[in-house]
Amino acid sequence: MARSIWKGPFVDGYLIKKVQKLMESGKSEMIKTWSRRSTILPIFVGFTFSVHNGNKFIPVSVNEEMVGRKLGEFAPTRTFYGHGADKKVKRK
């Protein structure tokens, strides 16, 4: 079920403050965050976020196509190593 429109998108307050500070200073630093639940806003475009995946921080460069999605969608938490190979290898 989607979030109610009257509430608006959820973004942690400190993320907006950090982005605004970087916009004022003109620097382009990586913003380190644990907030995977925050929605990507249009003011985030062009910035790089380090999103925590439970083990390490994954760099996520934000572009226009990502607006409206969550930061956590771009930092996978699980690694797939593939299914086990068949032990009965048939050779002819």
Swiss-Prot record:
Entry keyword set: Ribonucleoprotein, Ribosomal protein, RNA-binding, rRNA-binding
GO cellular component: cytoplasm; small ribosomal subunit
Gene Ontology biological process terms, A to Z: ribosomal small subunit assembly; translation
Pfam family, one: Ribosomal_S19
Example of a GO MF term: structural constituent of ribosome
Coiled coil: none
SUPFAM superfamilies attached to this UniProt entry: Ribosomal protein S19 (SSF54570)
Record's keyword annotation contains tRNA processing: no
Protein role: Protein S19 forms a complex with S13 that binds strongly to the 16S ribosomal RNA.
PANTHER family given in the database record: RIBOSOMAL PROTEIN S19P FAMILY MEMBER, SMALL RIBOSOMAL SUBUNIT PROTEIN US19M
UniProt xrefs under NCBIfam families: rpsS_bact
HAMAP family according to UniProt: Ribosomal_uS19
Family: Belongs to the universal ribosomal protein uS19 family.
Protein name (record): Small ribosomal subunit protein uS19
Annotated source species: Rickettsia canadensis (strain McKiel)
